Amino acid sequence: MKFFIAIFLVFSVLFSSDDYELPEEFDKQTYEVGENIFEQKCTSCHVKFIDMNKVVRNFFHEDNKMNLKAPTANQISFRLKQQIGDKSDIEFHLYETADYLKSYVLAPDRSKSICLEGVIKYFNGMPSMRGVVTEEEIESLNHFLYFLEGFNGINEYFHDETLF
């Protein structure tokens, strides 16, 4: 009996669901550069992370009781992947989301927002970041935002996007 328990434990460890493989498109250095850009140039309005369940409750049940001035980075990460382009090819999807982000960050327009109307109604319009961030910085920022949510193993902010 102990033999079978030992075999079970070995296989449980070898084939546990904690094993993952990061997408080959993930670049740690670009992610960290984008994260630094976010922290330096975006956090005056955007919070980096709030649990998605709390975010949903805040906007749809508590009338923005948290007084957020702008979507959180993890909200943007989630919506970016859901609303822009074809997510079946991560490499191409990164180009699509970067193009969108450049367009929006440099010339914001509510009609181009990826956020739900029930969320953006709480925010003033985003100011243009033209002259504040370069297109190259936006590409790094896009890499950070793209991989912030939904990819286990990159950071502590993973959640199961299929639940939303």
Predicted feature locations:
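Flexible coil segments in periplasmic/lumen-exposed cytochrome c-class electron-transfer proteins
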Residues: 39, 88, 111-164
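The canonical Cys-X-X-Cys-His
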Residues: 34, 38-49, 141-145
